[in-house]
Amino acid sequence: MNKRLLIYPLLFSAGLLQARQKPNVVIIFTDDQGYQDLGCYDSPLIQTPSIDRMAKEGIKLTDFYVSSSVSSASRAGLLTGRLNTRNGVKGVFFPESEGMPAEEITLAEALKEQGYATGCFGKWHLGDLKGHLPTDQGFDYYYGIPYSNDMYIGPSQQFASNVTFREGYNLSKAKEDQEIVRTSSRADIKKRLNNASPLFEGDKIIEYPCDQSTTTRRYFDHAIDFIENNPEQPFFVYITPSMPHVPLFASEQFKGKSKRGLYGDVVEEIDWNVGRLLDYLDKKKLAENTLVIFASDNGPWLSFKEDGGSAEPLRGGKFSYYEGGVRVPCIIRWKGSIPTGVTSDAIIASIDLFPTIMHYAGCQSFKQKIDGINISSFLKNPSLRLRDEYVYVKGGEVHGIRKGDWVYLPKTGNSKFKKGDVPELFNLKQDIGESNNLHLQYPDKVKELQEVMKKYQSTSTMPYAQVRDTLNDDRQYWIQTLVKIADPVISNLSKDQLKKNIPVGRSSSALASSREFITHMEAVGRTIAGIAPWLELGPDNTPEGKLREKYIKMTCKALANSVNPKSNDYFNSTATRQILVNS
């Protein structure tokens, strides 16, 4: 599909245009790295001299926020400058699930229109199907694992003619893996394939399974080669290491070298490669015209304990909306253009990078709504405070608000709302660990922050995007798959419903529990109807079979009427979940 970038150039005077060269841009966006997991953020065990050097040569941000506490949604916010209430990405994508809407304009597309060479190296996680890969979203070149490094091959992914097979694989065995993925539950896939992830170049697999002990170095190698091979254009290089997301892999050079186990080895290897890149920019005399940004996509995966990171002194981590889930390390370096050795507590967000970088590239006006703000004046003068509030978005919905030192979380910062949870109000200046809930002591402050939240809620325009265009062409395939995988309860209740002329799609993992499920659905506005075993939502003493049967009967009935929001049986996922919890 041809997209038209609705971006208008700044009207510079001729003299200013000649005097100012468009800067190169490098963004390094690590995966699941915690707030404390750098030397310059007070890690007691992990040594990161190269990133610490960046902090000495630039600005370290202590209050930098990403748009989500999970990967896909966070990356969508970074690359679009838009909150997840707008950009259509609510959760995490799995192989061959939905991708970010093709209509979204990425930073790569916008910079490409301004004459930039654009390359993506590492984890993408915004869709691996045709129309959603990096090379479909503005990048000239892509090299990496297209989603998390614990995910598997997609059934329809194509192999390059020069593909390298490892660990006893050949084309026939690789296609067997694709068939396993096509016909098995997610739990069975992970058990049988054991994190056999594909490495892509462009839109095809070039290595399977990927040797993950060497990916970090290879990502940076290819990024440096890309810069070397594009001397005539300004460049945008987006380096997205697949780690320290689990499973963890370190090369022999770094394995066992840190004081923080394998997790520390992985972070120190990333740091060493950051140093190689900085040295290259310095050696090639590119540093004074290259904006380099280092950040993490969300907080650490704490449930993995020693294989997860640390968000200390913040509370929470990945999946949560306490500070440790969405506040991450961020360092910005631009030699000769911004101050050095500065630590700032200004509230800055990943969505601010899009309008800021586009300002430097010569554009600042967009027809699509951009939620980020241009922080170029702050980068010149870090004493400025350009915003005093930031909204937390979970699953495409406004989940909380920070204003000044205050944070209000009406449904708590937990990843799942439990019976008995109460709203939370914290003062970060007095309580950075969010341990003292003040919502009863300060009712006026709660009301004030509720009003601020309403402002963001009223502008929410989540598109019909989490579900791909209805898959009528694949209808029989999905029906057969549903019947094959689903247990007898689902199959029997579904047979009559499958005869109806209901469009077929695949569910978003944003709605999924830890169990794999296939669903046929119709999306209307922002509501999705589907068949799925929401077993974890019921009371502990509810027999799983009874709960599942009740849910499926309710959903099947609603599914037939889902095209009519005014129907009494119109399916609303939130309402249905509540019925189950109270049953």
Residue spans of the language-model regions?
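N-terminal pre-domain segments of enzymes
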Residues: 163, 462-465
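Formylglycine-dependent sulfatase
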Residues: 2-6, 17-424, 428-455
